Every structure is written in C-alpha cells, then in structure tokens.
Amino acid sequence: MFQKGEYVVSGNKGVCVVDDITTLDISGVDREREYYILKPIYMAGSTVYVPVDTADTSMRRVLSKEEADKLIHDIPGIPLITISNDKLLEQEYRGCMKTNDCAEWIRIIKTIYLRKQKRIEAGRKVTAVDAKYFRLAEDNLYGELAVALEMPRNEVESYITREIDK
C-alpha cells in the first residue's frame, strides 16, 4: 500500500504525489471503496482517483536514486524497437507506454531518435505518431528521473548525456 505524501507513477499521468487515501462521496461510486487521491506533479490542477484495490496494476513507486543511476548506465544496452511497419510500430509504442516501465520508454526514445535522423537525412519530416510518442516517452522518463535524482526536469537530458559519455 502506498502512503500519503509518497511519489508514485500512475499510468499516463506520470509522477504523482499521494495526496490522500479515502472513500469518495460521489453519486454512483461505492462509498465503501477506498481511493488514492493523486496530484500529478507536472499537471497543475489535475487530480487522479485510483481505487486502492486496483492500484497494483496501474501504479508503482518512483525509482530510487540508485535505480535511476543504474537505468541511465544501462541505456546503451537497451534494445531498439525493430518493427518497420508504421501501423504495427504505433501499436508497439502504445504497448510500451502502457507498461509504465522506464526501460520501455527508453526503447521508444532511442528508436524514434534514430528514425528521426534517417528521415531528416532523406529530406522527410518526422511522422506525427513518432513525434507524439517521443514527447510522451520523454515526458514520463524525464519526469520520473527528475524526482528520483532530485533535480529540475529540464536538467535530466543533459545529466543523462554526461553520465553515458563518462
């Protein structure tokens, strides 16, 4: 069970703080069922309600600093997505995002970064699907790493680059 004040990752909402654990007084909602009341830290004014009894499938703790540093050092060995069919690739991106796994977000970022370079060299634009999933994966990854490493989100990318180049 998560505790009030704890940082968690919740689905596509990114890093959230557990604001409360309570029942809801809303019509049509089981008044006996407990919910985590989450506040996404990068979506001001948003609130997410997650039933406590289903949180195992949709929430997890934010990486520790040690786990974040290990993940960053493992980035060069994380494989690319090797699907060439654009429709299947979008399904794979979607599946990777749903896993709520930082390594899967890195796979998306690495794959799209290389696809983007190839398209630019060929005089073509980045696809809308690639742009969308690149942004989503970066937002989720950098948001979580910023919390884990206790640094501003806008410094995460340069930190990763420095650590990999060591």
What residue spans do the PLM features occupy?
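A positional/architectural concept
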Residues: 1-57
